[in-house]
Amino acid sequence: MAIFHYISVLVPTTLAVATPYVLRRNGFDSERKYRWLLYVACLLFFISWYLPSPLIDGQDTSFTTHFVGGGLFTGLFWVYLVSSMKWRAHWPVMVFSVFALVSALGCINELAELFMVKAGLASIKLDDTNWDILANTLGAATIWIGWIIADFMMKKGRLSGDSGN
């Protein structure tokens, strides 16, 4: 289980340092304005490893870990990237982009779990992948819906802040 303690620190720390650097190097100088989103996302990733998860159909899952550290984390990371790059597209494209990101990161996570088990670095069950994917997707969808509501309210003048324009 010790490897997961390292992952809970290493992944968010690396992202918190590397992502702003990469964005600034590529001309996205306004990313600093949105960096708090990155930090909140990374904090959620860290915390998610230590939250209890429910039994589902009598099966021990990591549903909460994936909802918070997979879905909510990815959703906030996506909002940080979209806001920093001032990227906007039609809503189906935006939905697809957040779904693609959460799916890609979820796939990488499942492959990492498989590798760690097969390499003897961890002893975890690999039979909850379907719940992991659902939790990741629901978490990201929660953030996306919140982002849409906040964006709508900013356009209507009900929230102060950057409307992304």
For each feature predicted by the language model, list its residue ranges.
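Bulky hydrophobic segments
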Residues: 1-125, 138-165
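Short aromatic-rich membrane-water interface segments that cap or initiate transmembrane helices
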Residues: 125-134
